[in-house]
Amino acid sequence: MGLHFSKEEFRVRKSKVLDSMKDQNIDALLMFRQESMYWLTGYDTFGYVFFQTLILDKKGNTILLTRAPDLRQAQNTSNIKDIRIWVDKDGSNPTDDLKVILDELNLKGKKLGIEYEAYGLTGKNTLKLNKSLENYCSVEDKSDLITKLRVVKSKEEIVYVKKAAELADQALDEVWKYAKAGVNESKILAEMNKVIFEGGGDYPANEFIIGSGKNALLCRYQSDKQTLNAQD
């Protein structure tokens, strides 16, 4: 497994979630936020653009419902032992597969917390989910339950934060070597990313934002790469 944190770190995180669920009288939490799944189990994927959910009940049972392409992704990057697959084909409804799991966990008539505010839970899938759970259990929006726990960083997390800051500084230092008239922005970006990857880093959560000339004041990344002139 490609876990980046210790078993003890993950144990503590899970314990905090279970304590929070108990305080909020939640029998189970349905996670749709990829960042929640990663924080709790190490599960690393961009497959969240399709329907998938990580179920955690108050007994500590953890079950991932996802598509076949993410089976090995979950096996290789997370500590999740129970991985269920829903078949992605015309007419399939993954909330039916979810109900089977909820039945196994005896959650009918219970109170479920759901991460409704999640990029992975589209409006269409939300309608399916709500219809499936109607008259089955009670639900509450618990989108921020794990998010609030993630705010306070552990010692292991702070090590990564400091390393990321060091790499960011090194990448910025590299910029000044190439910020000259006649140099294309693509070259600058390439050198910045080279520093990050050679330093043991990874893709940033947000692309590096670079701009000169008419794009100098843009606040978002865009694909129009300029060649710097003497006035930039």
Q: What would you call each of these model-derived segments?
A:
Residues 37-48, 133, 142-148, 152, ...:
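Short catalytic-site patches enriched in acidic/histidine residues
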Residues 1-170:
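A composition/biophysics-driven feature that prefers long, compositionally simple stretches
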Residues 176-183:
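C-terminal helix-coil-helix/basic helical segment that borders enzyme active sites and/or dimer interfaces
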Residues 21, 179, 196:
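Hydrophobic pocket-lining residues that define ligand/cofactor binding sites across diverse proteins
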